Amino acid sequence: MSAPSGFPAPSAPPSYEETVGINVNYPHPYPVPQPGLRPDGKGMNPPQYSGQPMPTSTPVTVQTVYVQQPVVLFYDRPVQMSCPSCNQMIVTRLCYESGALTWLSCGGLFLLGCIAGCCLIPFCVDALKDVEHFCPNCNAHVGSYKRL
């Protein structure tokens, strides 16, 4: 069927931009992607915010201070020092423990043929034992002296 001769043929409706009043002659702010392709985000800058200025940070300098403690050498005698646990000036308390020299002396005496338990004499001699140093105030272990 054809349209009546007195009426014009209907045309396509106007586009959205024409209806709303958007000027289609202005260029788009971002490139228009082609059909079938996704924009990858390259070359697109985020919008600039106005109003508050960007805060400027001042560089912070950090200075490290090293406090070197005097080196305390532990021997088989009490040592005067500052306790690292209670920070008091102390003279260490000694405790003798069987160590490598004690056991080697015992083994050597055993190989030489000491009979009737004479090879156990090194366990009674403090001069052959290792020495542990303790704080007399807080009983903290502050050091040790190994004979071997």
Curated annotation (Swiss-Prot):
Q: Identify the Pfam families for this entry.
A: zf-LITAF-like (PF10601)
Identify the keywords attached in UniProt to this record, alphabetized: Cell membrane, Cytoplasm, DNA-binding, Endosome, Golgi apparatus, Lysosome, Membrane, Metal-binding, Nucleus, Transcription, Transcription regulation, Zinc
Looking at the record's lineage, which domain of life comes first? Eukaryota
Does the record carry Metal-binding as a key word? yes
Chief location of this protein? cytoplasm
Where in or outside the cell is it found?
A: Cytoplasm; Nucleus; Lysosome membrane; Early endosome membrane
Q: Where is this region: Disordered?
A: 35-56
Query: What is the annotated signal peptide range for this record?
Result: none
Name the residue ranges of motif: PPxY motif. 13-16
Tell me which family the UniProt entry assigns to this protein.
Belongs to the CDIP1/LITAF family.
Name by which UniProt lists this protein: Lipopolysaccharide-induced tumor necrosis factor-alpha factor homolog
Q: Which organism is it from?
A: Gallus gallus (Chicken)
Gene name of this polypeptide: LITAF
